[in-house]
A protein has these predicted regions:
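Membrane-embedded alpha-helical bundles of multi-pass integral membrane proteins
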Residues: 1-280, 323
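Short acidic (Asp/Glu) and glycine-rich catalytic loops that position anionic groups and cofactors
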Residues: 37-41, 224-225, 300-304, 352-356
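General structural signal for alpha-helix termini and helix-helix connectors
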Residues: 67-71, 309, 381
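Alpha-helix boundary/capping residues
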Residues: 68, 245-248, 328, 379, ...
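Flexible gly/pro/ser-rich segments immediately N-terminal to CXXCH heme-c attachment motifs
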Residues: 153-157, 161, 210-220, 286-298, ...
Length: 426
């Protein structure tokens, strides 16, 4: 009867040795993840998400599992393949561990008979999806590397290392499967349609005599690379695989184009406590949700591509702004005055038109505008504005328009603007 023999082709001590090897990697992973995310992500899903847990799960399904924003562009399809393939293969590995370490000692096997055969075919199919997605992503990253600016080189190299590591796992997974069929042929090998074909190719190449040695070497290197990627997750761009889904699920209830407010005047009137901070100078002044969202950023640049201020040639880059704040967060500099240290430049803050195009473009629902507005408010509250900006704000306060025109001339101005717009169209 078909049954999964997980450690059948390695020495008896390898099973214990594998878990001993995994232990230090697991410690590095858990400590790093706790330092990066703590329990803030889960807490925000419960306390901040719009519509409760059901709505949070719905957002995760639409924008996490189905990658609706990511897949809107052709370059997003490889990511969808990588994501789905990784998710299925991770689930498959988990099922294998449960079958061998939990149910087998209890006298029950999960991966046996027809269940095991369907499992093998399903895993092979999504393994192909995983590898194809990684190959497409690798080609795209290598092509893009030529035009990448210095500020993005480091993150691009991280992505390349991550892609190569995952690709190694995908390819060696198939090779290990093929070697298993060479060493121990079975009648049901056809259900593993990739492994059985690769086994035929390797046999034709004369791998048979060294199949056992090759299998053991690949088995250990496969495990080592997998454990290394797990341990690196909290410290590299791979962190977005955890932070992004949590940020998707923990979205606030207000519309994407609605600006944040530092306080509710009605609540202040009711409580009588008027000691409020209008703006922000450091990350510690921002809402915990905004600080958490920084860790979900993948530096993809979609916000830059749709930013009208950047298209007009201003210095503003929503991507660079978020990445600069993210770097301070990961360095633990949450109390640093980012305005005084010029981490966030005044010109960048005033270049933003608050159109929220970046908010709509972000695949993980980061809101760059929500970082800009508090810092801009601080500049106004601290009178760190030039004469033109002072006049602009005074005109808005005095006459409700930026030009300082009397209220009775507003209709005339609107008519002139419509006329000018009409003549330009002609």
């Amino acid at each position: 009867m078909p049954v999964r023999d997980t450690f059948g082709l390695v020495p008896p001590w390898a099973e214990v040795g594998l878990y001993v090897l995994f232990a230090p990697f697991a410690v590095v992973f858990v400590v790093g993840l706790w330092r990066r995310l703590s329990w803030a992500g889960l807490r925000r899903i419960v306390t901040h998400s719009s519509g409760g847990i059901a709505a949070a799960i719905g957002r995760f399904g639409r924008f996490g599992l189905l990658q609706r924003r990511v897949a809107q562009r052709p370059r997003g399809w490889p990511h969808l393949g990588i994501f789905l393939g990784f998710l299925v293969l991770l689930a498959a590995t988990t099922i294998v561990a449960i079958d061998w370490d939990i149910t087998r000692p209890l006298g029950f096997r999960v991966l046996i008979g027809q269940r095991y055969l369907f499992f093998e075919s399903f895993a092979d199919a999504f393994g192909v999806v995983f590898v194809v997605g990684l190959l497409a992503a690798l080609i795209w990253r290598l092509v893009r590397l030529r035009s990448t600016g210095p500020d993005q080189r480091r993150i691009q190299y991280q992505f390349l290392v991550l892609i190569c590591g995952l690709l190694y796992l995908g390819l060696t997974g198939f090779v290990l499967e093929a070697l298993r069929f060479i060493i121990h042929p079975v009648t049901w090998a056809g259900w593993s349609f990739v492994g059985v074909r690769l086994a035929s190719l390797l046999s034709s190449a004369g791998v048979g005599p060294i199949a056992q040695t090759t299998y053991e070497a690949l088995w250990w290197t496969h495990a080592f690379v997998a454990f290394s990627l797990i341990a690196s997750l909290p410290y590299t761009t791979f962190l977005h695989s955890v932070a992004a889904p949590l940020n998707l699920m923990a979205q606030p209830g207000r519309p994407q184009k609605e600006l944040s407010t530092p306080f509710d005047l009605r609540q202040l009137m009711e409580t009588g406590e008027f000691d409020v901070k209008v703006g922000a100078t450091s990350l510690s002044d921002l809402d915990s949700g905004l600080r958490f969202a920084l860790q979900a950023c993948t530096n993809c640049g979609r916000c830059d591509e749709v930013c009208p201020a950047m298209a007009m040639g201003t210095a503003l880059s929503p991507r660079r702004l978020v990445q600069a704040l993210r770097a301070r967060l990961l360095a633990g500099l949450t109390s640093e005055d980012v305005l005084a240290r010029n981490v966030v430049k005044h010109a960048d803050l005033w270049a933003c038109t608050t159109c929220a195009a970046c908010v709509e473009a972000c695949p993980v629902f980061i809101r760059p505008v929500d970082y800009i507005i508090p810092f801009r408010r601080q500049l106004v509250a601290g009178q760190q504005i030039d004469k033109r900006q002072t006049e602009f704000l005074a005109n808005l306060s005095r006459s409700s328009n930026a030009y300082g025109l009397p209220a009775e001339q507003r209709n005339q101005l609107a008519a002139e603007l419509r006329s000018a717009a009409g003549s330009s169209d002609e």
